């Protein structure tokens, strides 16, 4: 019996597999031989859980790192088979669609990446520790040295980047869930130790909308000044549209994808905004070999997978913020990230 199986051999999946191979036995599963060949220290299987059903019975914990369009079917199959699943994939539907599908002897942790994921864990901690009723999440994955005119870089997915600018952002305001046009309003914010940035409401709260009974809750995604003005212009001009036979969006994605420097910086500030303020602040930098975004996304999922091995009693549908409500588990995750060189401060 292997300790871990990572489903999906993209750059996030490969990073997860590399981390978990140092924690126990691990196999990486992907139908693309080229993706598998980029990893040398991990057992590899070419295929899927559908074409290689023996994987289901030969691994303890599964980490799904697939594109959202195909992740759902894989997750459904794993849960139907009663497996423990950590899911870093992002899909449009509410993760609660799987709540009723989780057998009593299995576990499903959705949205377990950087943001959503680590941001949820921190928010769950602040909510439980300080009984806070107002939480703000400020998050950004930025190039260390922005290039004009884009003033940004694609550290995750170019499709996901554009989606952030067109998908209505859900937030909680005065106890009610509301939607906001992401580019309808911009904010100024200066992270500690960093230059002043601008931000916009983004739709990254996910399960937090349903699990935290607070008065105010929002996520603001950060950008260098000038970027959002450019994005608003492109959106209004129709460059994010996908309705025509010759898609303006596809052309825009191709242009944006040229800005992909690995030297990025990740910022995450999760703040209780009650009368007495409490903050968790994270800073991390990419290098020649790996983006910070890939490290934080992959390692958050991988560390969470190790928790399922360490705490076999964990069961059921478990949004990431539930881990944050347990101070011991939350500290374990943050300390493991600190061990990887991620700077995290709590005040």
Where are these regions (language model features)?
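Rossmann-fold NAD(P)-binding glycine/threonine-rich loop
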Residues: 88-110
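Glycine-rich Rossmann-fold phosphate-binding loop(s) that bind the pyrophosphate
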Residues: 9-10
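NAD(P)-binding Rossmann-fold cofactor-contacting core
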Residues: 24-40
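C-terminal catalytic/substrate-binding lobe primarily of soluble NAD(P)-dependent oxidoreductases
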Residues: 129-347
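Hydrophobic Val/Ile/Leu positions in short beta-strands of Rossmann-like dinucleotide-binding domains
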Residues: 5-6, 28, 64
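Beta-loop-alpha module in the N-terminal Rossmann-like domain of NAD(P)-dependent dehydrogenases
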Residues: 61-78, 92-94
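N-terminal Rossmann-fold NAD(P) dinucleotide-binding loop
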Residues: 13-14, 71
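Short acidic low-complexity segments
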Residues: 46-58
